[in-house]
Amino acid sequence: MDNKLDGLELLRFLAALAVVTYHIPSIGIGHFGVDIFFVISGFVMMLSTSNNTSQFLLKRVIRIAPLYWLTTLGVFGIALLAPSVLKSTDASIIDLTKSLFFIPFDKNGAGHQPVLAVGWTLNYEMYFYALFALSCLLCSRFRGVLAVSFIVVNIFIQGNFDNFVSQTYANLIVLEFGLGVALYLMLKKDIFQMLAVLSLIGIGALFNFEEGHRFFLFGLPSLFLVLIAISYSNRLPNLSLIPLLGGSSYALYLCHTFIIRVFDRLVDWFSNENSLLEVSAVLISLLGSIGVSILLFKYLENPILIYLRQKLINKTH
């Protein structure tokens, strides 16, 4: 399987862009981008550990945590210094600590409410990273089957408790990582393991079928979108822009709400029910979010990643 999957990079960017459109008030469509992310994540975890599983968890923490921590601290700073700017975020040290350590919590009955609102998905990411890392340690050959087994067993266990953390990990959305694992095994023609993973996913889905509408409506279609993206990778033009967009998708996902809020304020000040200006503001919000995310990736996120990898991975590997 070709490790240069430009189709996957492009889909990653489009998934982030879909989440951006979901948070633009006048559009409000695109939350399925998160489901695409989760399927991609399961696939990439299998692909990235196909030859070497060592230091997997460290590598993923280095990739995910720095920018998330910076943006979370930024939001906390705003909540502390200018609380009127934010609607539902308090300058709570307890909330900050839970957010930085990827611990799910319920804020005033509003569901997932980390300091950086979009960070709820990263709680799921880190959860699966931990299970996958454990699976790599136990048996790297069957790491995918083991990881999905842990997820399904935990769905059964956590589903018996009413607390928010348990209900978070019993949510069928976690099975979307398993879809990515199954896709990798299918493309590797490992039919036995693929069928094992799909059987486990089916068992997990049946346990909480009535609450699993998101998994069925968006998770399964996301699987086919990821398959299409991988299949067409070699047919895409060899453009440096595609890896750049894919690389900046994480910054786009984390930071877009700030940019949208700025342009929303501008529209409120100047629009006077001017529909043309409102349409322009939507386009500017999209383009502005993309532009800022590319700058953040090139001049902040990527330099930090390179530095941490050199200091923490290359020296110990």
Label the predicted regions.
Residues 32-35, 118, 169-172:
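Structural signature of hydrophobic alpha-helical transmembrane segments
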Residues 1-8, 14-29, 46-55, 105-111, ...:
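Alpha-helical transmembrane segments in multi-pass integral membrane proteins
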Residues 8-15, 34, 40, 68-71, ...:
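Hydrophobic alpha-helical transmembrane segments of polytopic
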Residues 10-11, 119, 123-124, 255:
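Short alpha-helix carrying the canonical HExxH Zn2+-binding catalytic motif
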Residues 32-88, 233, 259, 263-264, ...:
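Juxtamembrane transmembrane-helix termini
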Residues 93-99, 108, 149-164, 173-177, ...:
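A short, conserved beta-to-alpha structural element at the edge of catalytic cores
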Residues 40, 58, 64-126, 130, ...:
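Membrane-interface helix-loop-helix regions
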